[in-house]
From Swiss-Prot:
Stated name of the protein: Probable tRNA pseudouridine synthase B
Active site: D93
SMART domains: DKCLD, PUA
GO BP term (any one): tRNA pseudouridine synthesis
Gene3D superfamilies the record matches: Pseudouridine synthase (3.30.2350.10), PUA domain (2.30.130.10)
Gene Ontology molecular function terms on file: RNA binding; tRNA pseudouridine(55) synthase activity
Family: Belongs to the pseudouridine synthase TruB family. Type 2 subfamily.
Keyword tRNA processing annotated: yes
Classification via Pfam families: DKCLD, PUA, TruB_C_2, TruB_N
Cysteine disulfide links: none
HAMAP family associated with the record: TruB_arch (MF_01081)
Reactions the enzyme catalyzes: uridine(55) in tRNA = pseudouridine(55) in tRNA
Length: 348
């Protein structure tokens, strides 16, 4: 019988050839330069060298959730350890282990971006009767693409059929009635229900034996940390001044938007956006080449700091070629005022 009790080790070492990438990981792009510019080192900060005191109030932890507690309980423990508000980026059932991104302090606002990033799991399905490998492969392949899924009875959302996307299913091993497989999906897909539906389609029934999330958007289990790492990293920083450990645990908030297409702006445009303006074309320094109208994009300084996120009103080519117009409708601002000076001229 297959077992996932050592799934973190198993996944890290044995599944490299069974990758199930998320759509954003497959996108190819270049960085187009619209305007050659440099950033003033007097303003802002290197996001990967933020003062620890600020990092502890504005960061993300790639936590490996243990089996047993609810996601809410885990977040409460982290909040008590750090002494700052916290939130998680996607609920895991108590018995499910794996990647649970936890945002600290002001970084909690970034969690919404993970909803579109997709998830990846390794699951152990137990069939109620033996089925040929050929039939298992044939049926499971039919669940890749757009599926109709009704949330399970115990879920908190309304029990109505929903269209959801399954990006990839790859079978790792079949041992009698047990099927170990890897699956990547958009957010909101219930793997337990997916397995139930596969069992129904096979005509024998099935249930989920064990589940581990190995990826949530840009966060992967390979660089996840345990609850004890949070405690230890804080101790070594406070007692010994060791920053290396704590910087591996408390990641810059910019790590949480790695899956988004990016636009880098001039120093002179930063304060305007921080104070509520949309991003105008003249403020763009460089950008990803694969931006489409309607994409959720992240706006960054030339140092890499996250300024805001918003909806692209132009594609990359238009942003590069046009001299004026609004390029991005800003939805949420992350940067606090004061890090960059105001450089616009007041009217009237």
């Amino acid at each position: 019988m297959l077992c996932l009790s050592l799934m973190r080790i198993f996944c890290s070492k044995c599944l490299e050839e069974q990758e199930c990438p998320l759509p954003w990981e497959l996108e190819k792009y270049e960085i187009w330069v619209k305007k050659e510019a440099e950033t003033n080192e007097k303003w802002g900060e290197d996001p990967y060298n933020r003062p620890i005191e600020r990092l502890l109030k504005y960061s993300v932890i790639n936590l490996d959730k243990p089996s047993g507690p609810t996601s809410h309980q885990v977040v409460a423990w982290v909040r008590d350890i750090v002494g700052v508000k916290a939130g998680h980026g996607g609920t895991l059932d108590p018995k499910v282990t794996g990647v649970l991104p936890i945002a600290i302090g002001e970084a909690t606002k970034v969690l919404q971006t993970l909803l579109i990033a997709g998830k990846e799991y390794v699951a152990l399905m137990h069939l109620h009767k033996e089925v040929s490998e050929k039939d298992i492969i044939k049926v499971m392949s039919k669940f890749v693409g757009t599926i109709i899924q009704t949330p399970p009875l115990r879920s908190a959302v309304k029990k109505r059929p929903r269209k959801k996307k399954v990006y990839c299913i790859k079978i790792i091993e079949i041992d009698g009635k047990d099927v170990l497989f890897r699956v990547s999906t958009q957010g909101g897909v219930y793997i337990r229900k997916l397995i139930h539906d596969i069992g129904v389609k096979l005509g024998v029934g099935a249930h989920m034996q064990e589940l581990r999330r190995i990826k949530s958007g840009p966060f992967h289990e390979n660089n996840s940390v345990y609850l004890q790492d949070i405690v230890d990293s804080l101790y070594f920083w406070k007692e010994e001044g060791n920053e290396e450990y704590i910087r591996k645990v408390f990641l810059p908030v910019e790590e949480a938007v790695k899956h988004l297409k990016k636009i880098y702006i001039l120093d002179s445009a930063v304060a305007a956006i921080v104070h509520g303006a949309n991003l105008a074309v003249p403020g763009i320094a460089k950008l990803y080449s694969n931006i489409k109208k309607g994409d959720l994009v992240s706006i960054h300084t030339l140092k890499g700091e996250l300024v805001a996120i918003g909806i692209a009103l132009m594609d990359s080519k238009e942003m590069l070629e046009k001299k004026r117009g609004i390029a991005v409708d800003i939805e949420r601002v992350f940067m606090k005022p004061g890090l960059y000076p105001k450089m616009w001229v007041s009217q009237g």
